[in-house]
């Protein structure tokens, strides 16, 4: 069978070659026998081609149903063919002149030739185009179905007729109405037209043409061939779809569908009036040039007044091949269809209207914003969703972002390529190497503190801070020196501190505290490292040990480069001996309702529920500190932490604790790379009293703010919410607490920002969002903070698979029902099939402290609300995570962006080169709700325990509220016309007295501005 096919193919090729050879031989023989005939045929064919091409370019196909003037030459077809021959001769004349375009033309000679064939008209713009004039707006019959539109149309027509007469021209109204008593025509094209009498007045060379809302049905190129001044009132839409009380329109293909109240529907094409010049070719082959002027009408923004004014006539056909750009200036129909999209773009104001072909709706926005969103969507590493577009529109303050985002998203689908989201290990940055401002080491090779175990789920994943000399110096600069707080407490706050100490340690337990014995300390230390440290130093431990503070960079990941966080370790003897005091003290603190360290997850959730029940008419306030450890001033420690400890313990133990306290707050320290520094009174993050210090400082600030609001001591104490280190959640008491707490922390030298959370929204505390603490224990890890860190672990002492499994075991315990996070953990455990082994202390803690999770649907809905995405998108992303088959195939599900706050080297590039970047906390993303700032002083009928207006507190700002934009001042009966290319407003003229009334309504005035549209 194959041999037969091969034979057929060979025979076919042989026959084809033979036929070609015979044909070439015959043509060559014919050329030798009849050379003149063949030459004439070739030249004739070329000329015929040029004639047909030029004829088609100049004389386009006309719609036989369009309005055309009855005046004109006879034998139009013959004239056009004759003109096409003239154009062909001009083309060959040009080719000979420029040697078929090989040499540039002589512009001086071309201009001299064209000058001899140019007939110019005087500039008619001063006569016909308005200059700060007014138009009488005539009232319409009250029974009219769309009276306002009719008023504009009739008034514009009357104005154009009068202005033409003032200029010395008799008006000729095309498709005239009953109110037109001048020359014009009226033909019958639809049943509605038979209600008026037929007219067809002759057109003279002195007429000026007036088109009022009818040019859509006219062949404007034929009318312009009369070379007469032409004035129009016409629809020039700025959007693809529009509606008001009287009319609405939309585009279907390149036609506009116009509906009016009363049931009328009109469908037609529009003329594209653009630029400052219009060209037309008349039936005699002359090029006619017109000036074009446009004016917008305020109050009737979808219509314009347009003037097409004769400027010059060129009779030499050489214009068709010269540099006149006549073809680009021809008046053509407006086209909005571009593939599957419909687009209207006004380049001067950069107003863009875009929609899908076949849709009745569109989106109006700035062209720059559209291009920015399109570019960001097309460059996404992850699959784009409607929520991505919605978020970008909202950030750009786009008014209708909810309804416009889905429409705009579908407009991108053909242009945006959806790429696979697989990112191979090693193709993304893992660490950043901080560079200090002063004396950095240029030869240092920093250490990689962790290891990557999977591909990241975000496009720009979190980074480890590299360790070394430069990192230590950057830490000192950013975490200690830059935020150092030496502010003294004002007298009022010294008094508040004394009250606070007495409330923490009431009289009933003051002086009763007894430190634990050394043996009890070992029993309470449940970590292996703690017991090993105890066993190593216990036999030789002395009460006179000198503390040695050594700081190291904490192995953790950051969303972007910033000053690394340090841990200040104490001498083991100091840690053990101070624990003898801190452990019994912690038991006292745990009895305080607002004190959350030591509480289990359910107890913390119950406390949050109690906070949420306070002042339910106002928002919840989430505390957000920046570098709290570094901003502790001496007064915070000396007026709060130290007095509380000294007040609780019996007198015989106070001296020893004071010595330990002085050793903890020793003023000399060194880093792991040997850099010395002065920590002053900053919180010692590696001491046994670290959590106590941060939590007490935070709670005191809340207490002081409540006291400033006028609450008495007991009420202020009872209203303190939930506090854990630098995390806090409080009711926004009286709607003003957030202002007072920010004021207090500012006065006391700390860096704080209130994040207001509307009731019903998930609440953020301890890096977790609580769905609804009042009704549910459900919570989930802060999504973007957690998802960006899933791909790496600080544990370098295990294999990649074991490191991934250890991390997954922790999250399967705390977030098994959390979308994406729980899916990642389950998939990692299914792939590795490993149990927990040799995990870090943090991983062990996570595995042993499960946050309750029950309602998966509620968690998913809350997470979607936090991420501002659709639940369907979250489900799709969750499914994408569950489909991977290896650790290096996890997809990118979110786009993230680095916001570097520290000069550093990342993946071979220098980032954060602006050394004066504002410091921000890396604890969580911003969730501040700016729409609910302070409204003023507390209400007098508020809490019965609240006092009067505080004498010293934050300034009272106005609450931002949403509402309608106020109406523009001015006479509503005065309408203004502005230049179509300008956004400036026109100063209103002196108000005119109504001289006449028609139909019981005064005559209005329409004002417009004299400036050109480019």
Swiss-Prot record:
Highest taxon in the source lineage: Viruses
Entry keyword Repeat: no
Span of domain RdRp catalytic: 618-740
UniProt key word Nucleotide-binding: no
Single GO term (MF): RNA binding
Catalytic activity of the protein: RNA(n) + a ribonucleoside 5'-triphosphate = RNA(n+1) + diphosphate
GO terms, biological process: DNA-templated transcription; viral RNA genome replication
Biased composition (Basic residues): 956-967
Residue numbers spanned by region Disordered: 918-1014
Family per similarity comment: Belongs to the nodaviridae RNA polymerase family.
Role played: RNA-dependent RNA polymerase which replicates the viral genome composed of 2 RNA segments, RNA1 and RNA2.
Name listed for the protein in its UniProt record: RNA-directed RNA polymerase
